[in-house]
Amino acid sequence: MAELTTIARPYAKAAFDFAIEHNAVDNWAEMLTFAALVSENETMQPLLNGALANTKLAALFINVCGEQINKQGQNLIKVMAENGRLSVLPTVSKLFSDFRNEWAKEVEANVVSATELSLEQQQHISVSLEKRLARKVKLNCSTDTALIAGAIIQVGDLVIDGSVRGKLSRLSDTLQS
């Protein structure tokens, strides 16, 4: 994973810098997300890892993407194909999204709760995180009944485990030591 990130970072940074310069950050985010989906397609995977000539691969990839990718996006695809890097497009898209969120002072928070959260609870969590992190927060909520009760909130490297399962696990660790 670290190697993919190292390979993808220069492409993501170049795309992000270009998008900032041309006031097209959201457009580039959409293009890269779409291109990443195309590259992850099971039909496309063998071609990305196969012996197809890089120029033909770039042309095929651009043809598949159609009008979803503009001229500058096509140029990025061509450069990545020439360097044999189209397979890292999902990582490029993720890094671009990270750069965008940092630039816009936004973060994504993954909230896993034992039961579905009401809109009021989601808003309370969002407001609390915004105060703590000094950033705009976008919640991604899901449920996991194995938590028993409570929730686990993850924002980047920060993990807040307020679940009963987590508390029981910590109690068990304490008793065993």
From Swiss-Prot:
Membrane topology listed for this record: Peripheral membrane protein
Subcellular location: Cell inner membrane
Cellular-component GO terms for this entry: plasma membrane; proton-transporting ATP synthase complex
This protein's record includes keyword GTP-binding: no
Keywords: ATP synthesis, Cell inner membrane, Cell membrane, CF(1), Hydrogen ion transport, Ion transport, Membrane, Transport
Alphabetized GO MF terms: proton-transporting ATP synthase activity, rotational mechanism
Subunit structure: F-type ATPases have 2 components, F(1) - the catalytic core - and F(0) - the membrane proton channel. F(1) has five subunits: alpha(3), beta(3), gamma(1), delta(1), epsilon(1). F(0) has three main subunits: a(1), b(2) and c(10-14). The alpha and beta chains form an alternating ring which encloses part of the gamma chain. F(1) is attached to F(0) by a central stalk formed by the gamma and epsilon chains, while a peripheral stalk is formed by the delta and b chains.
Protein family per UniProt: Belongs to the ATPase delta chain family.
Its job: F(1)F(0) ATP synthase produces ATP from ADP in the presence of a proton or sodium gradient. F-type ATPases consist of two structural domains, F(1) containing the extramembraneous catalytic core and F(0) containing the membrane proton channel, linked together by a central stalk and a peripheral stalk. During catalysis, ATP synthesis in the catalytic domain of F(1) is coupled via a rotary mechanism of the central stalk subunits to proton translocation. This protein is part of the stalk that links CF(0) to CF(1). It either transmits conformational changes from CF(0) to CF(1) or is implicated in proton conduction.
Annotated protein name in UniProt: ATP synthase subunit delta
Organism ancestry: Bacteria, Pseudomonadati, Pseudomonadota, Gammaproteobacteria, Alteromonadales
